[in-house]
Amino acid sequence: MIQKKSKCSDYIRRVFYTLLGQKRFRKLLAFSLKSRYKSSSVCFPVNIEQVKEILIILPEERLEVLHQLKNVISLVKHFKHATVTIVCERSASSYIKMIPGLNVIEYEFQENVAIPVLLVKEVKKLNHIDICFLLHNNPSLPLRYLAGVSEADTRVGYDGAGGFPFLNLQIRPDTTKRYFADWNCSIAKLFGALPDEIHWSVAQKTIDEVNHLLKELNIEKKSYLVGLDIVFLLNHFGNSWTETLVNNIAQLELGQLYFYVSENPSVSCVEWIQKQKVPFIGDLSASRTAALVSRSNLIISGNTPIYALAGLLKKHAIGFFKEDEIEMYCPQTSTLMGISYKTATEEIIAQTMSLIANHNKKRKT
């Protein structure tokens, strides 16, 4: 794993980046990369059988990584004869490591760093890269630069993700696909990879660790677990609305409620949570969060990693989505249910309770 390092050279690069500004620095990086490539053209379609080395660059955010998993797995299956290396931010690397047979280069995200020097060194250690996939719709400058400096014959990304010399093949996603994970798979489809259902599971060791954590909270192993992404609810709907929802759910006596506390809750959120008579589980690693979702029977959240994990692990979940989000991020399946909202209203609580009641009725039949 690549660790953060405080060096004089890093400081100088940050100062230089700040003085020039992102737009000028991008032009400077593009100019420095153009000398590596004789032509901006690319040979397509690619001869799949001749591909030996693939580099996949993933987004920095956990949620974006989860939305790319279907794409990644489709590509890995399609290029099963090739060596696949994934570049992934450390906090999300556990998700990728659950896919067997991959080389993973981890790094820690740093703001205001235009040239990922340590990442470049790691990529340079690889054999000649045939294809570099930049799987990000709006990649940061460091990730664009990494794709450019990979010197891959084919450097592919989404339309608008970066022109030559960073990328030499840009894909316009299939506009008939509304669900984001399927929309992302436009790249896999272009190369002949057929997106498949994700069969994803959490290591038993990690599940055992979470079971031990639940035991410490006096939650029985066989409890029917209902997890509320409490920080999301408080931030989007406020204390009063959230408290009403929690009380209504508690009255149903579904099973054991718990609060999932995501990263960096505000002081006011922490104070509110501590006043409630509900056990809470704080900021878990990516793998333990997946294990917690795996152990849960119902998740209530929104457009968040925990909701995306519920979808991947085929767990029941109810999500709150803004009107411009629900079609893209909630597929509305037998397990994933979504509610569209503008503001916190009693009607949304009523809709939520109706979905929970239907879910409870089905599980008892």
Annotate each predicted stretch with a short phrase:
Residues 52-64, 201-268, 323:
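Active-site donor-nucleotide binding/catalytic segment of nucleotide-sugar enzymes
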Residues 2-49:
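Positively charged, low-complexity intrinsically disordered leader regions
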Residues 116-122, 127, 240-318, 322:
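Donor-binding and catalytic core of enzymes assembling or modifying cell-surface/extracellular glycoconjugates
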Residues 91-93, 139, 265-266, 305-306, ...:
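Alpha-helix capping/helix-boundary segments
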Residues 160-235:
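Mid-sequence helix-capping/hinge segment at a functional interface
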Residues 52-175, 288:
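Active-site and donor-binding regions of nucleotide-sugar-utilizing enzymes
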Residues 24-28, 32-36, 42-45, 264-273, ...:
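Extended, non-globular alpha-helical segments
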Residues 2, 6, 10, 157-158, ...:
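Nucleotide-sugar donor-binding patch of glycosyltransferase catalytic domains
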